């Protein structure tokens, strides 16, 4: 028996806990920002725009008493405009299938019909913790108003517990971890203690480029795009990464590239800097644009993309 196996057994004998936690909610309630703060590192993309998360991202946080394996899901789509949205909703449902705890995120002082749609998808026999996010908003700073809002939402579903946080500012994140911990099963850790995600460097590079697309383009255009890593080469002291951005129309390609290529250059530069920080190495990044008409309704193609 090696030392890691022995120590893992000692942890389990001492009541160590480890389990899966799904983070769910309607689009744009701050799920990805919350997960990034929970694990202490940015691995899930964030944006003020809805539906920035398309793939389930697994983040891992480990301390001396528990290991939390968080699954960040796409926002549940109530507008089924195409096959892509249907696939995103399927991702949410699949993520809920094998978890030990569900964290249901809502925006402070704003509970909508879209939130209720998500509630109806939640498993009946899995503990669900209500998390009221964005308590830094002015309307949520009134303690009594916030308490009344939490009571209103708790009346909609049989929640195991509730917590109010500000994912943006990292407020009450430690409290939330302690709230989740008792609902995790006693188990040895599933991952090494220094591991923060099970996603590959290729996947993280793709997500970084997607985040920049959402940041620098208009309200609708990023939803008509997909990002593919065509090549990822790791050398001594340098990662060479080649990424294609897929769009539906030539007109979208022109918008993405921008006048004189300035917009694409800005997106590429900021993405490269973020990758160098995340991978702790120099990065050569090449980003270009491809046109494939109707890709968001092509079910076979979506499967090839892993969506």
Curated annotation (Swiss-Prot):
Q: What is its main location?
A: cytoplasm
Sorted alphabetically, the keyword list is:
Cell inner membrane, Cell membrane, Cytoplasm, GTP-binding, Membrane, Nucleotide-binding, Ribosome biogenesis, RNA-binding, rRNA-binding
Task: Cite the residue spans of the region called G3.
Answer: 72-75
Q: What positions does the entry give for GTP binding?
A: 25-32, 72-76, 133-136
Single GO MF annotation: small ribosomal subunit rRNA binding
Known SUPFAM superfamilies for this protein? P-loop containing nucleoside triphosphate hydrolases (SSF52540), Prokaryotic type KH domain (KH-domain type II) (SSF54814)
Which parts of the sequence are annotated with region: G1? 25-32
Tell me the Gene Ontology biological-process terms attached to this UniProt entry: ribosomal small subunit assembly
Report the residue ranges that make up the KH type-2 domain in this protein.
217-293
Which family does this protein fall into?
Answer: Belongs to the TRAFAC class TrmE-Era-EngA-EngB-Septin-like GTPase superfamily. Era GTPase family.
Reported function: An essential GTPase that binds both GDP and GTP, with rapid nucleotide exchange. Plays a role in 16S rRNA processing and 30S ribosomal subunit biogenesis and possibly also in cell cycle regulation and energy metabolism.
State the protein's name: GTPase Era
Per the UniProt record, the source organism is Neisseria meningitidis serogroup B (strain ATCC BAA-335 / MC58)
Q: What lineage is on file?
A: Bacteria, Pseudomonadati, Pseudomonadota, Betaproteobacteria, Neisseriales
Report the gene name. Answer: era
